[in-house]
């Protein structure tokens, strides 16, 4: 049997081209993910720097000023130090749970960013159940904290892990009920659709005016989910040394540090998306840019402006969260649980029932 060499070469060339297409497709698929991770990292560094500057201003002292101009590189210096510190393991602890816990806490929060729309065309995954995916994924983080507390074989760590789980359950329910109210108003669970519904009437179409009670409950619950003062009971220094972080050092301790700020950023982003119109702005900025001859119809211009508006609103709430941390004292554990179960839960449930009633009457 005579084999045609021309056909063999054609087949080999075709297979190589198909393999090249698969590689290019894989790279093209990873580019948005890597871009999002890079943007999240930069956002965390900015939050750390802002918190140090704001806290220094509130306490009337000088903040970081040596590492870079205005101390902007201080967070990078601290992260580098933690990266090269020794990773100490507890001798009688569960090493597997101890090592897996920080990773679960960070990964579950990073996955939440996949459904956040920074602009109409700038979202990693436009899912029909976007807000529920965020709630479901963020509920995994307390499991990692509980694993860390149990795996440390330390009474302070275990108490901190139990507090983190109890606090998360207490405030996850009111937060979910507030999200359900927003979904009923928008007739959708997609984050893109929720923002688009708010764009019809400018600033007066924001869910802030349609759900003022839900906004307050959501804001308090999101702060409690981030375990920030006055809700930082799981890592209260005076009672539990450092809570579930007590036995950690090096990069694993740094992961908890990063997870805290990642959670704060994602909560502020969802406040912007759900209640403050996302990338929409009532000010007619397009006419202002038109005076300078800037092409307003291009997709790049719209995406850039949408991302800028979203981040501007987000960092406003970050400022409020940071100022709250350095202003209010810590609550007791019984006060924290009573606030969640006896106050926020009935209010959020009543808000959901009222929203459902109004939606049924409007049909």
UniProtKB/Swiss-Prot annotation:
It is a multi-pass membrane protein. One of its GO terms (molecular function) is NADH dehydrogenase activity. The chain crosses the membrane at residues 30-50, 104-124, 127-147, 253-273, 300-320, 343-363. Its EC number is 7.1.1.-. Keywords: Chloroplast, Membrane, NAD, NADP, Plastid, Plastoquinone, Quinone, Thylakoid, Translocase, Transmembrane, Transmembrane helix. GO terms for biological process: aerobic respiration; photosynthesis, light reaction. It is an enzyme of class 7 (translocase). It is found in: Plastid, Chloroplast thylakoid membrane. Belongs to the complex I subunit 1 family. NDH shuttles electrons from NAD(P)H:plastoquinone, via FMN and iron-sulfur (Fe-S) centers, to quinones in the photosynthetic chain and possibly in a chloroplast respiratory chain. The immediate electron acceptor for the enzyme in this species is believed to be plastoquinone. Couples the redox reaction to proton translocation, and thus conserves the redox energy in a proton gradient. NDH is composed of at least 16 different subunits, 5 of which are encoded in the nucleus. This is NAD(P)H-quinone oxidoreductase subunit 1, chloroplastic. It comes from Piper cenocladum.
